[in-house]
Amino acid sequence: MRECISIHIGQAGIQVGNACWELYCLEHGIQADGQMPGDKTIGGGDDAFNTFFSETGAGKHVPRAVFVDLEPTVIDEVRTGTYRQLFHPEQLISGKEDAANNFARGHYTIGKEIVDLCLDRIRKLADNCTGLQGFLVFNAVGGGTGSGLGSLLLERLSVDYGKKSKLGFTVYPSPQVSTSVVEPYNSVLSTHSLLEHTDVAILLDNEAIYDICRRSLDIERPTYTNLNRLVSQVISSLTASLRFDGALNVDVNEFQTNLVPYPRIHFMLSSYAPVISAEKAYHEQLSVAEITNSAFEPSSMMAKCDPRHGKYMACCLMYRGDVVPKDVNAAVATIKTKRTIQFVDWCPTGFKCGINYQPPSVVPGGDLAKVQRAVCMISNSTSVVEVFSRIDHKFDLMYAKRAFVHWYVGEGMEEGEFSEAREDLAALEKDYEEVGAEFDEGEDGDEGDEY
């Protein structure tokens, strides 16, 4: 089997996790208590969904997941929520005191105490796998736990499971909407370790997803639940090929191989189509070509950056539902002719496609319409650098005055770590610049030879 272990860290990670497991259960027909009436092979048969769920002898399906937070309130919601019987109590790990939006608390003082317990639980899950493929890590980098404990766990996972791939689903701070003053510090410090310890990181940003909910679903004031349900559709589409048998299956390691041209250039944009409310879906024909086009729309991107400002290096299209390869090829051919969608000159093909025949499911009473087919796109575009340069700019403004730094130093960090992390990100911005402008110098030189 190709099992994946999901690790949900901090409030954002846990709440996105709730939405994901709710959706997985719906897709596989698993009830809230873990029983699965439709499952014929009791006791861990070789079903495709066993990549995400382990089966007990009693026929109960338990998610291969760990939820970690430094304070109990968010995890208590899982412990008392609809799916409380789904998870093993040992999988829900909560501390007693908060990281207080402070990377240093999450990474050094408070996080240190809980990290061994987390690794112990992860080890138990890993021992239960026959062929562990990798980890899906869910966190946000603006807060204290997601950034601090998140990067600490990633560092330790690299030591313990060096060869296993790690996919990050990371919520980055939005340009306008902010949840804490020290977000820029936490994000820069955390990205420093994401750079080294994740293989692929998919950037999400609340503001971009708010806008999608407002525009496409006509929700005037979206809640986090609305946002998370949309994000969970993306994550479900990515992992569908691991959980169902499909026509063109895509493995977690394949994302890495196809999307990451250089190890550091591994921050991805994601988009999903069709995002459409039930009232509208009734009146629209959503063909493969149409949903493919809308996945490339700048307004569909789940992070606030404009792909028209950069070039694509590679992109991965995951279709699900009533889709045949012929339609996909036609849709991709059309995309390639568009002037607005530019690829770097050193990557002429640039498309990886996957098809899964399982149509997308929706949460009953949710906002999304039930549709016949959907596509999720993960793309590696140089425009992602906008996300980093925005955060770096805010970081510089605060750090020039050393504002709030004493809170971090007081928890045992050194000021040098700030400048080290900031330099690493400056190097990353430069890397993106060079990747986008790979062959321009050469072309200018050649023109002289013609006459």
UniProtKB/Swiss-Prot annotation:
From the broadest rank down, the organism's phylogenetic lineage runs: Eukaryota, Viridiplantae, Streptophyta, Embryophyta, Tracheophyta
* Main location (coarse class): cytoplasm
Any idea which residues bear N6-acetyllysine here? K40
Name any cofactors this protein relies on.
Mg(2+)
Tell me what this protein is called. Tubulin alpha-1 chain
Q: Where's the active site on this chain?
A: E254
Q: Which GO terms describe its molecular function?
A: GTP binding; hydrolase activity; metal ion binding; structural constituent of cytoskeleton
Q: Does the keyword Metal-binding apply?
A: yes
Organism, per UniProt?
Answer: Zea mays
Cite the PROSITE patterns for this sequence: TUBULIN
Q: Where does GTP bind?
A: Q11, E71, G144, T145, T179, N206, N228
Q: Name one Pfam family in it.
A: Tubulin
EC annotation from Swiss-Prot or TrEMBL: 3.6.5.-
